[in-house]
Amino acid sequence: MNINLDSAKDVLCKNILIYGYCKFQDKGCAFSHNKQLTTPQQQQQQQQIEEEEESIRQGGTAVGVPGSQRNKGAGAGTGAKAIQSNGMVNSQETQSKRRFDANSPLFQPAVNNAKGTAVTNLASKFSNLSPRIRDAPVFKPENESPISQELNSKLATSGLGSIYSSKKFNASTPSFTPTGFDFSVAAQVGNNPGSTAPANLQLQQKQPQQPQQPQQPQQHQQQQQLGLQNLNQTQLGRNLNVLLQPQISQPFIPANAIPPSSAAGQLQLHMQVQQPQAQTQPPSHLTPSSIMSSAPMSAGFYTSALPIPQGGGMRNQPPSASMYPLQYHLYAPAPPPRLAVPTKEYETDSQQLFLPNELRESLHRKNEASLQTMQHLSLPDHVNSYHSLVPIDKSYDSSSKIWPGKSTVLFKCNSNFDGNLYALRKIEPCNEIVDETPFRNIRKWKSLHNNANIVALRDAFTTMAFSNTFSSPNSSAGNEVVGANGASLCFVYDYYPNLTTLLERHKKGIRVVPITEDLLWSYLTQLVNAVAAIHAKKLALRSTIDLSKIINTTEDRIKLSGCGISEVLSFSASNANASSGEEDEEREFARLRALDIVDLGKVLLELSALLLPMNLRASLTSTLLKNLANSTKLSQNFLDVLQVLTDPSLLQEPYSFDMDQFILQYISSHFMTLMNKLQNSHDWVELQLSTELENARLFRLMTKINFIISEMPTYDLNSQNRLKIIKVFQENLFNSVGPNGKKVVNMDRVLVNLNKLDCGIDEKTLLISDKECMIITFKEIKELIDTQFRLLRG
């Protein structure tokens, strides 16, 4: 292939056109590899076109005006024809640089070619539909305000129009007027050259805000026009930049950054007042006020009420508490058995050195639930000696089914006496309680706090704290409505976080636990333990034995809650004034005790019915017992228990049910099974606790070493020499290399060396650094650490 080297350098290489690059560019390729390479003639033509466009833009009559705008046809001037031909030749270059340009010459095809007749006919086809381009009227906005017209004239006379016209996208062009732009502020800044916009904004912040009166449009326009008369070229450009910058770079302020007690007008800037109200606001579910906090309220919980500095940013504000829960579920989980590294009998792995993931997450959830607080609640600050009330009731219906005519709500609260968490149940109305007589047996209920299957009762009282004034959502601000509930009855119990009732666990929960016979025997044993202890104190549960009042704390452990409420609510003045003898009291207690036994049988029967299909869960007790005997695998012993506990003759005199005989005959053998489970659970918990036994000791040792090393530059020369040994030991402690030469996390090395250091044994160890190595015992290292730590404290 013959190539002319002189002309090849002006020819674009085909590899650039096809592939975008040429791999022979630096290896002897004779063609050009520059896409923007143009000939001198093309450069001259391009420069001439740019000069003509610049003259047209400045409003002058250039020689190069297209011929189609002067003379239509072949009689155009020679200058116009030359310009038109040059524009057609360089149409591709100009199109690549200016894709959309309103100032480009109008394209007019030549009529002296072979297809000129067709083009002429096509042009004449639409000649009657629209006027000529040169006769088209200039577009002017209909609703253009006098302010924008005045600004256009100012910009045209000041020479800023040519500067702004060279920019493609500029908010300061004459045809653009930002919404809500206040030119009166620009006039004030222009009259005071030494002042700036932030200073004026600060003055406006100090002035008390008055209700804004609607201003007349004409008066407002006159004020703005008077302000524009004092603007010159330099002040106009400076003021536009000063006033437009806060609109663009205004920092976002959360909705709850201003406490309710602070004045709302102190943080509102002037430009924010002028903004339209249809501004985009963040979603309500992303604002911090709608998120439940995971930390207790403290002095640092609330955001600062100080004005935000003009320098931008909120760095100087005090850090607030974390608004999101702990990410305890992000721990590395244990691998499945098929992926676990096989270990020998005498070997162990890091998973066995710490708590299991399930137990750790369960404890984290309980701690998180204990520390949860809720903001902006219309609840009293203090109820008797308790504060920080948080509703924890999962039911949206406050009306009680156990105590008809009453509404009940459950709260979590803190005690002023010991600082512990308690569960406070509010019951209202309680207008029938007029003195302390209904609370005469509360001391007996408090004495049952040692029973493992009863939620301990701590306090009972009536209060007017919930009947204080509260704001009505339909009333205007400041109007208050007096609560009509009157006094409220409150019972305080021990608090168990993240608990569930048996109704939620087995019947109406999201993930119900299936019922088994072993589980039923366990529930029966624990309920009998609680009922027997209550009856031994000459007390009765009455209507408290219900699936919604039996809570599940851990695994299969249950507790009776709500004890003592039915007794207080069922008390009446007639009972207190009635003179009844001991025989009547014994007969009444026997009747109440029989009611408790029947309620216990109903609870077990309701749980046993969950083993049957829906069509076999009859309402009659006798039919349900037959279906359980025919359609389930329950043992005959448990069916006999259900038969005894649901016998209608229990509610008939002489109320001959004997609890001790029932325990010996039916439940004694299952007490051993329950005790075996409890002992195994106790041993497992103790084993898991032993894995965390040494964590505190080793953590204190590592903390002591880090404190000593952090103060290394402040010691003298002798101390630095001793400190150098400690630093080398720390580096060797966490510097483990695997067989492939890469660093590994050797947990065994860290634990073994820290335990040896804590004991101070005489074993020698080799410490290696970049420049030296030393042999020293753990006892000497421990003495150095203790000495340096005493110097640090002294």
Swiss-Prot record:
Low complexity composition-biased segments: 200-226
Q: What single Pfam family name could you report for this chain, choosing any that match?
A: Pan3_PK
Keywords, comma-separated and alphabetical: ATP-binding, Coiled coil, Cytoplasm, Metal-binding, mRNA processing, Nucleotide-binding, Zinc, Zinc-finger
Cellular compartments per GO CC: P-body; PAN complex
Coarse class of the primary localization is cytoplasm
SMART domains linked to this entry: S_TKc (SM00220)
- Tell me which PROSITE patterns the record gives: PROTEIN_KINASE_DOM, ZF_C3H1
The ranges of region (Disordered) come to: 40-97, 187-226
Statement: the UniProt record of this protein carries the keyword ATP-binding: yes
Subunit field text? Homodimer. Forms a heterotrimer with a catalytic subunit PAN2 to form the poly(A)-nuclease (PAN) deadenylation complex. Interacts (via PAM-2 motif) with poly(A)-binding protein PAB1 (via PABC domain), conferring substrate specificity of the enzyme complex.
This chain's protein is named PAN2-PAN3 deadenylation complex subunit PAN3
Q: Which organism is the protein's source?
A: Lodderomyces elongisporus (strain ATCC 11503 / CBS 2605 / JCM 1781 / NBRC 1676 / NRRL YB-4239)
Gene from which this protein is expressed: PAN3
